[in-house]
């Protein structure tokens, strides 16, 4: 077995951008800067105060296989939100018009396009003093300045290794579709612990107590409002907890993967792997999988993921209330026209009757009311050991598949499903169990989010 330091040396070589890649990125950055400057000159609006380059490119922590360049158009802070968004969108669409730009949405719209497979984001922000934030993007130029002043070349290499590791295990990125660790968070982790090995050692040994990570002494007045499993204080904004975007599942996966790497160092942890299931595990869960597939109308990926996740939570709750007990669920979309919900249920069919426990026998009126409501159905009554009146109730739905089909075909506006998802479902949907057909690549990808089946982390014994 290789020593972990040997593996990290290999990973560093793997992550280091080649000179041709750096030259390509620098050329594109200059090209886009010129295009934005030209658009700003053409628009000639004195509310536009400047332009800055940000993100991993500006900080020197980008990955060759996943690079983007962020441009922040600085707007006068006196501009209202509607005009702020209009100005940012106008500049972005104008500057990137030759590259089929499109709108993306975070806290406000921004423009994205791809040039030679490099993702370009043009984002409006207010030109404000530190701490006087008016939009979520206002912090970004300060993040760039902070990291360029504090990260040395050695630490930049360590950041790349950490990014590559997180990307390999599927938890890199703070967007809703991932719920993982952002590039900025990886930079903070390396600044705090100085190396990749020290950072993952901390993670591998996390306990039940909330883990607090801060570069400066945290302000005690804000700590009570942070309730995530891991608290990561933004060094330029003590009121902001970067850990809030990290899901419990992503943190748990990070902990397991960190332990596995420390115990069995291998360069394989830094190489992306397709979501391939151990077929034995897949066969075990198939009978208890319940899948809903449907078409979606085109809208922002950030919006659709949020709608899907909220609707997934609502449907999982309904399945559990009805006795099928969804103890695992996930969703998937191609962000264009296809979406699916996947549920891992305890029961796919239920008995004809369920127990209905009534009031204590000493509560006279409640007991009489309970019996009167039930007796017309000719159901038996008895007194249990807790001296409560008990009867049985006939279930309307014995099949999880039929129950979900009926639920989605009816009025679901009052169960918490997003209204846009309801409209999508109205055009048609398909409900099936995992054993009823061959699972497509989207469903397999969804299952890789739901079930830990990465052979580097869960090492199943071969027969």
What label would you give each PLM region?
Residues 154, 159-336, 345-356:
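Conserved nucleotidyltransferase catalytic core and NTase-mimicking acidic/glycine-rich helix/loop elements
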Residues 334-463:
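Extended, charged low-complexity segments
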Residues 36, 40, 86-133, 319, ...:
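Conserved catalytic core of two-metal-ion nucleotidyltransferases
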Residues 21-24, 28, 32, 80-88, ...:
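Short amphipathic alpha-helical segments
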Residues 54-92, 119-131, 337-351:
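Catalytic metal-binding acidic patch
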Residues 1-64, 81-82, 110-112, 125-127, ...:
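N-terminal regions immediately upstream of nucleotidyltransferase
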Residues 14-22, 73-77, 294-301:
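Glycine- and acidic
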Residues 114-170, 174, 194, 198:
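Internal, well-ordered alpha/beta segment that forms a basic, Gly-enriched binding/recognition surface
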């Amino acid at each position: 077995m290789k020593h972990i330091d040997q593996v990290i040396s290999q990973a560093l070589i793997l992550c280091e951008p080649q000179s041709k890649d750096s030259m390509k990125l620098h050329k594109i950055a200059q090209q886009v800067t010129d295009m934005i400057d030209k658009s700003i000159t053409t628009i000639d609006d004195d509310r536009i105060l400047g332009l800055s380059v940000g993100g991993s490119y500006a900080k020197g922590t980008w990955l060759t296989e996943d690079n983007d360049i962020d441009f922040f158009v600085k707007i006068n802070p006196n501009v209202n939100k509607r005009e702020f968004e209009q100005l940012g969108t106008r500049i972005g669409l104008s500057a990137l018009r030759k590259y089929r730009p499109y709108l993306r949405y975070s806290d406000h719209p921004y423009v994205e396009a791809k040039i030679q497979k490099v993702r370009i984001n043009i984002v409006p922000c207010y030109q404000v003093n530190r701490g006087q934030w008016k939009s979520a993007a206002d912090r970004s130029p300060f993040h760039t300045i902070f990291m360029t002043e504090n990260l040395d070349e050695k630490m930049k290499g360590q950041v790349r290794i950490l990014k590559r590791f997180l990307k390999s295990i599927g938890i890199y990125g703070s967007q809703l579709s991932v719920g993982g660790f952002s590039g900025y968070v990886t930079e903070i982790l390396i600044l705090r612990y100085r190396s990749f090995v020290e950072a993952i050692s901390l993670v591998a040994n996390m306990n039940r107590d909330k883990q607090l990570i801060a570069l400066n002494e945290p302000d005690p007045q804000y700590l009570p409002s942070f309730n995530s499993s891991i608290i990561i204080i933004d060094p330029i904004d003590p009121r902001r907890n970067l850990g809030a975007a990290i899901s419990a599942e992503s943190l748990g996966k990070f902990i397991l993967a960190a332990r596995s790497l420390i115990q069995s160092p291998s360069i394989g942890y830094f190489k992306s792997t397709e979501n391939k299931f151990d077929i034995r595990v897949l066969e075990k869960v198939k009978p208890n999988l319940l899948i809903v597939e449907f078409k979606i109308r085109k809208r922002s990926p950030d919006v659709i993921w949020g709608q899907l996740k909220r609707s997934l939570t609502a449907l999982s709750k309904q399945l559990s209330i009805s006795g099928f007990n969804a103890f695992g669920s996930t969703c998937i979309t191609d962000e264009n026209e296809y979406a699916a919900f996947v549920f891992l249920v305890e029961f796919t069919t239920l008995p004809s009757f369920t127990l209905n426990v009534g009031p204590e026998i000493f509560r006279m009126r409640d007991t009489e009311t309970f019996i009167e409501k039930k007796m017309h159905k000719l159901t038996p009554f008895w007194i249990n050991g807790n001296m409560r009146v008990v009867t049985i109730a006939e279930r309307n739905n014995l099949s999880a598949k039929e129950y979900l089909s009926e639920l989605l075909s009816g009025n679901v506006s009052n169960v918490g499903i997003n209204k846009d998802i309801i409209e999508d479902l109205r055009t048609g949907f398909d409900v099936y169990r995992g054993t009823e057909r061959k699972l497509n690549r989207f469903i397999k990808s969804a299952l890789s989010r739901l079930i830990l089946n990465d052979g580097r982390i869960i090492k199943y014994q071969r027969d």
